[in-house]
């Protein structure tokens, strides 16, 4: 019988990677909590209409990439391709936006049916930062500064911030009309996808990945030529706030992002260290999304960090993996030893909860248990055999350096083990 393989484009995250992943997530969580953001968790499955109305019918995501299916009641459901729409829906459903402002973060898997390649997967993970009910460029700057702090905390310097403004609905309409006129003049040069989008949403032609279209797209009208006074003032203040904070950036008038709900500020953090998939974080304002989904007009801004890409960039920039190893591994040898050794290690866990202890389970000779202790990555082995049992003693043997073995009484084990590990210069893992 053949083995069942993982679905193409959906990767397993193995134990040697999860410890580093968790350590990075903890840095993000602590930083967001320090800025007053709270976690929200929303379903990974939503009604398909949520994404059609928010992301936009004429987008690659909705047209080509969503995992959509009918449930047993015939209702169309979709695995979430991004998190913002679900978070906004949750805010509306649960009354979080009634004369309130919310600073939220969330993390979890997203799903898009794309061609799998390095840095682009069909199941991928994002860390989302959302601020609902906040107007003005100050919150835009705060979120961008938070992301900058994340890179700094992880030792990542190979990133560049790109900024643009899409303007208000009125200025976006002017830009759309100019795009339509421009692409109509060059209709014969458009590929089939772009011709289909010309009447429905010409802005999405700018998302084209067709290399034959690049020159045409590069010469298209840009958003900054059509900005209204309000958007100009908003963007100018944002730039001043970033300058004041020492955040370097590049204004990219062709940055539009791939989802229809964006307005005013849009931004991306990009790197040249990961090949074609160089966007690590992207986001912007979506002031019209709540009303678009049936709620009251609510200003908002958010961004998403791609966790797989962030982890890869962390490694490329010299980040060290976090070892998910125990501090101590208990070796118990002899038929009469198991019960008292088991009780001893549980008592030690109560006394010293910060020390990570793995007990050998499943028996085995002294030699085989010591091999397991070494493979576990533990700093020390705790050894108890029949002689130690008779004397109520336990051996502490260093596994990572040649410093011999000492013996201590059971009642002294917690204090002695802490001191022994501290003297070896080993801190708590992770």
Pin down the residues of each PLM region.
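TRNA-recognition modules of translation machinery and tRNA-sensing kinases, especially anticodon-binding
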Residues: 1-430
């Amino acid at each position: 019988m053949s083995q069942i393989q993982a679905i193409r484009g959906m990767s397993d995250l193995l134990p040697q990677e999860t410890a580093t992943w968790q350590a990075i997530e903890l840095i993000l969580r602590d930083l967001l909590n320090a800025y007053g953001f709270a976690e929200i968790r929303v379903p990974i499955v939503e009604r398909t209409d949520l994404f059609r109305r928010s992301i936009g019918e004429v987008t690659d995501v909705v047209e080509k990439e969503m995992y959509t299916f009918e449930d047993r009641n015939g209702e169309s459901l979709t695995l979430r391709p991004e998190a913002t729409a679900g978070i906004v829906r949750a805010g509306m459903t649960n009354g979080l936006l009634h004369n309130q402002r919310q600073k939220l973060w969330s993390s979890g898997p997203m799903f898009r049916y794309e061609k799998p390649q390095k840095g682009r997967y069909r199941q991928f993970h994002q860390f989302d930062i959302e601020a609902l009910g906040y107007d003005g460029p100050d919150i835009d700057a705060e979120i961008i500064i938070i992301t900058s702090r994340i890179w700094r905390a992880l030792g990542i310097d190979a990133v560049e911030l790109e900024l643009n403004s899409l303007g208000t609905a009125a200025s976006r309409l002017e830009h759309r009309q100019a795009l339509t006129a421009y692409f109509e003049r060059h209709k014969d040069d458009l590929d089939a996808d772009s011709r289909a989008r010309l009447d429905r949403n010409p802005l999405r032609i700018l998302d084209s990945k067709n290399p034959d279209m690049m020159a045409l797209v590069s010469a298209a009208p840009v958003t900054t030529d059509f900005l209204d006074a309000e958007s100009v003032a908003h963007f100018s203040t944002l730039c001043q706030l970033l300058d004041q904070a020492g955040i370097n950036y590049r204004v990219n008038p062709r940055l539009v992002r791939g989802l229809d709900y964006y307005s005013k500020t849009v931004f991306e953090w990009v790197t040249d260290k990961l090949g074609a998939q160089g966007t690590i974080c992207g986001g912007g304002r979506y002031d019209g999304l709540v009303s678009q989904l049936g709620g009251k007009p609510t200003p908002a801004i958010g961004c998403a960090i791609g966790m797989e890409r962030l982890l890869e960039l962390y490694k490329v920039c010299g980040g060290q993996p976090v070892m998910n190893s125990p501090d101590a591994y208990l070796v118990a040898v002899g038929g009469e030893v198991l019960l008292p050794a088991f009780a001893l290690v549980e008592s030690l866990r109560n006394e010293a909860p910060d020390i990570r202890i793995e007990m050998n389970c499943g028996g085995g000779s002294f030699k085989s248990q010591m091999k397991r202790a070494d493979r576990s990555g533990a700093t020390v082995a705790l050894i108890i055999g029949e002689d130690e049992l008779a004397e109520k003693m336990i051996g502490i043997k260093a596994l990572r350096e040649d410093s011999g073995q000492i013996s201590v009484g059971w009642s002294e084990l917690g204090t002695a083990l802490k001191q022994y590990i501290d003297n070896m210069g080993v801190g708590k893992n992770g």
